[in-house]
Amino acid sequence: RAEIAAAVAHAIEAVDLQGREKTFISRLSGGQKKRVSIAMELLANPRLLILDEPTSGLSPDLDRSMMELCRRLSHQNCTVLMVTHNMSNINLCDKIAFLGVGGVLCYYGAPEKLNDYFDVEMTSDIFEKLRDPEQIELYREKYYTTPEFNRLLAACPEAAQEADKRCSQ
């Protein structure tokens, strides 16, 4: 029992919900419910955590805190795969991917190289570029010439060939 209580306390602390342990879920805000959901996942000590918009609806300070938690998890033998449209804390990510309309991979790599790669001043401008089919094709082809893609190609040639085949359809 003590081990379970300690694990629960650690998960609650990780998502900054101390003092809410006895609160009914129906009485929590949307952001708090989201954090409870993540805390429940943390109890399983996952090796892979897949999150869909985990920071939407959170205040800026909690958004940053949640992204820092994901970064800590990624450095503790847990791969964190996250879908987000919030660009304010992407500098906390080790790698990011940008997909064009239709799921076409246009970029995968370090967040600090994004703006140069897409030739934009503001990261949010990338979304507009990746709505245009011609721009998507341009960046898909550009990505295939990057050192990052070549490293992935060498490590997983079958996966890269399958991705290319799907994008060409």
For the regions a protein language model found, what residue spans apply to each?
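Catalytic Walker B motif of ABC-type/P-loop ATPase nucleotide-binding domains
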Residues: 49-52
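Hydrophobic anchor residue at the start of the ABC signature
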Residues: 38-39
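Short loop immediately C-terminal to the Walker-B catalytic DE motif
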Residues: 55-56
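Topological signature of polytopic alpha-helical transporters
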Residues: 3-7, 21, 95-169
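ABC transporter NBD signature
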Residues: 29
